[in-house]
Design a protein with these regions (language model features):
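Conserved alpha/beta-hydrolase catalytic His-Asp/Glu region
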Residues: 173, 192-247
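Catalytic active-site module of serine/aspartate enzymes centered on a nucleophile-bearing elbow/loop
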Residues: 280-343
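Conserved HGGG/HGGXW glycine-rich cap/lid loop of the alpha/beta-hydrolase fold
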Residues: 55-103
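Gly/Ala-rich beta-loop-alpha elbow adjacent to hydrolase catalytic centers
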Residues: 139-143, 147
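Short beta-strand/loop motif that positions the catalytic acidic residue
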Residues: 248-249, 255-257
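Flexible "cap/lid" loop of the alpha/beta hydrolase fold
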Residues: 152, 161-189
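Active-site loop/oxyanion-hole signature of alpha/beta-hydrolase fold enzymes
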Residues: 96-135
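Conserved loop-alpha-helix segment in the C-terminal half of the alpha/beta-hydrolase fold
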Residues: 256-289
C-alpha cells in the first residue's frame, strides 16, 4: 500500500505538468517571422523548445532581448514592455528551461539547470529566430548573470549589456551560512562520506524551500516552480560574473542599481562595476525608491532609461554615474538634470 501511494505521488505531478503544457505545445508548429508578433514555442532541437513572446520593431528601430529574473516568466515584464513597444522598440521575451511556459512544458525539473546550458540555449534561439546581431540585452538578477555569461562566451554578438541588479557572485550571507552548516555537519558526523557539493546543495535546498515562498509568493503559482527555482540556483551558484568582466565589449555595460534592493547590496554591485575595465563601462545608474525587481517597481522609469540606451544617447556612453528619481521623473549627474519617464 505504501509503495502504491508513493508511485501515485510521483505520477501526479508528471501528469499535471503534461496537462499544463499541452495547450502551449501546439503553438510550436507556427512559423516565426521577425516582421510579425509571435507568442508560442520555438524548437531548438527535437528534445528542446523554448516559449517566446515577440513584438517586432518599427522600421529602422532596434530590438531588445529581455532575460528573466530568478522567479520571473515573460509575464512579469508586461508593464516595462508597454512603453518600449509604444516607442517602436522590438522586444523579445522568452522563458528559459525552468521558467514560465517552458517549465510547464517539461515539468518537473529534477536536475540542476546549468547556466552554461542556458547560455547555449539563448545563442541557439537567436540563431533559430534569425534576429540579426549584435544584440541588445537586458537581464534582471539571475538574467543579468545569464546575460553576462553570454557576453563572455560571445562578446562579438553583444552591442549593449544592460544589467539590472545582476547576479555577480554567490550571496555572501547565504554562502557563509551554508559553509558553516557543512563545517558543523563534518564535526558531528565525521564518518559520513558526503561531498561538500552534496552538503551544500542539501542546505541550499532547505533555504529555498523555507524562505523563498515568503519573499517571493509568485514562486507558488504552480506546483513545479519552487523546485525549478532551486534547480536554477543550483546551476548558477558556482558562477562568478565578476570574474568575467574582461570580456565585455567596449562601452557596452550599463549597470542599473536599486538603492532599496532587498537581495543584492549596493556594495556588491559597486564591487562588480570596479571590476569592469574602464573601456567597457558605458553608464551606471542608482535608482532611488526602487526595490530589486525594478521593472515592476518603476517600469516607466526603467523603460525610458533603456530606451535612451537603445537609441544611442551619447551621454549614456561616457562611463558616468547617475542618480535616478523615478517619482520626480529625473536623472541627475553632477549639476546636470535629465527629464525622464515619471512613475
Amino acid at each position: 500500500m505504501r509503495s502504491f501511494l508513493l508511485s501515485c505521488l510521483i505520477f501526479i505531478p508528471i501528469t499535471i505538468g503534461a496537462s499544463f503544457s499541452s495547450a502551449q505545445s501546439q503553438a510550436s508548429t507556427k512559423d516565426f517571422d521577425v516582421l510579425r508578433a509571435y507568442n508560442g514555442f520555438v524548437t531548438l532541437s527535437p528534445q528542446r523548445e523554448l516559449y517566446v513572446k515577440y513584438s517586432p520593431p518599427a522600421p529602422s528601430m532596434p530590438t531588445v532581448i529581455l532575460i528573466n529574473g530568478l522567479t520571473y516568466s515573460t509575464r512579469q515584464w508586461e508593464n516595462f514592455v508597454g512603453p518600449l513597444v509604444a516607442k517602436g522598440i522590438g522586444v523579445l521575451r522568452f522563458d528559459p528551461i525552468g521558467q514560465g511556459e517552458t517549465l510547464l512544458k517539461y515539468a518537473p525539473a529534477l536536475l540542476p539547470i546549468q547556466i552554461e546550458d542556458q547560455i547555449e540555449d539563448l545563442y541557439n534561439l537567436l540563431l533559430k529566430l534569425n534576429i540579426k546581431g549584435p544584440y541588445n540585452f537586458v537581464g534582471l538578477s539571475y538574467g543579468g548573470g545569464l546575460a553576462a555569461g553570454f557576453a563572455t562566451a560571445y562578446p562579438k554578438l553583444v552591442k549593449n549589456l544592460v544589467l539590472m541588479a545582476p547576479f555577480t557572485r554567490p550571496l555572501e550571507g547565504t554562502d557563509n551560512w551554508i559553509k558553516a552548516q557543512i563545517w558543523a555537519t563534518r564535526q558531528i558526523f565525521p564518518n559520513k562520506k558526503f561531498s561538500d557539493d552534496e552538503l551544500y546543495d542539501h542546505f541550499l535546498h532547505q533555504i529555498v524551500y523555507a524562505t523563498y515562498p515568503q519573499a517571493e509568493p509568485v514562486i507558488l503559482e504552480n506546483p513545479f516552480k519552487l523546485e525549478a527555482t532551486f534547480r536554477l540556483v543550483q546551476g548558477i551558484r558556482k558562477a562568478r560574473p565578476i570574474d568575467w568582466t574582461h570580456k565585455i565589449p567596449k562601452k557596452a555595460l550599463h549597470l542599473m542599481v536599486a538603492r532599496q534592493d532587498q537581495y543584492i547590496s549596493v556594495d556588491v554591485l559597486d564591487e562588480y562595476w570596479d571590476a569592469v575595465p574602464e573601456k567597457a563601462r558605458a553608464s551606471r545608474i542608482y535608482i532611488n525608491g526602487s526595490e530589486h525587481k525594478m521593472v515592476e517597481a518603476v517600469p516607466n522609469f526603467t523603460a525610458y532609461w533603456v530606451h535612451q540606451i537603445l537609441m544611442g544617447n551619447a551621454k549614456l556612453f561616457k562611463g558616468l554615474d547617475y542618480e535616478g528619481y523615478p517619482f520626480l521623473g529625473e536623472v541627475r549627474s553632477g549639476s546636470e538634470t535629465i527629464k525622464v519617464g515619471k512613475e
